[in-house]
């Protein structure tokens, strides 16, 4: 673990790009010393940016009635709710359920016959300016961002056992 006092950040939002990138550089430098190798990609936790989650349902009409892998990928990329949240960017889309005709829930829709495919998913959104500013400060350190996560989500996942993650649990982050 590389640690350094954070500067240029207030309530999870960038207030000074150069101060923040300097803090990140020093923390990464210490982590590289401890690890014994160079770091080029990072995962970034977000505490600011007014994150929220929304459960959505997206539908796709299947052209030849047989669901293909490409149909599933198209549905995973589809974000029909984006227009509702103009200043926000989707950082995560976690599938809850796939449904074919007659609202039949299926585990794996690939190869099944249906005219439609529906995906119910939990989507996580964060203010796009917060993402852009954090990404810029990280890129100033010659690093690239692999993925963004919201801190409560990561904290919650880290405290659950496999059964709780699979079956569902309520986590209260105070």
What kind of region is each of these model predictions?
Residues 2-42, 46-172:
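Nucleotide/phosphate-binding catalytic cleft detector across ATP-hydrolyzing
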């Amino acid at each position: 673990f590389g640690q350094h006092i954070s500067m240029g950040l207030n309530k999870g939002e960038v207030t000074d790009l150069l101060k923040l990138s300097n803090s990140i550089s020093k923390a990464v430098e210490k982590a590289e010393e401890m690890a014994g190798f160079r770091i080029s990609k990072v995962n970034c936790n977000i505490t600011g940016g007014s994150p929220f989650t929304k459960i959505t349902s997206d539908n796709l009409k299947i052209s030849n009635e047989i669901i293909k892998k490409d149909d599933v990928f198209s549905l995973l990329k589809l974000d029909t709710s984006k227009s509702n949240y103009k200043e926000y960017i989707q950082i995560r889309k976690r599938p809850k359920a796939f449904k074919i005709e007659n609202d039949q829930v299926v585990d794996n829709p690939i190869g099944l016959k249906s005219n439609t495919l529906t995906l119910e998913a939990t989507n996580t959104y964060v203010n796009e300016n917060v993402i852009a500013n954090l990404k810029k400060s990280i890129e100033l350190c010659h690093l690239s961002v692999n993925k963004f996560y919201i801190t409560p989500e990561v904290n919650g996942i880290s405290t659950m056992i496999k059964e709780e993650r699979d079956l569902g649990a309520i986590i209260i982050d105070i």
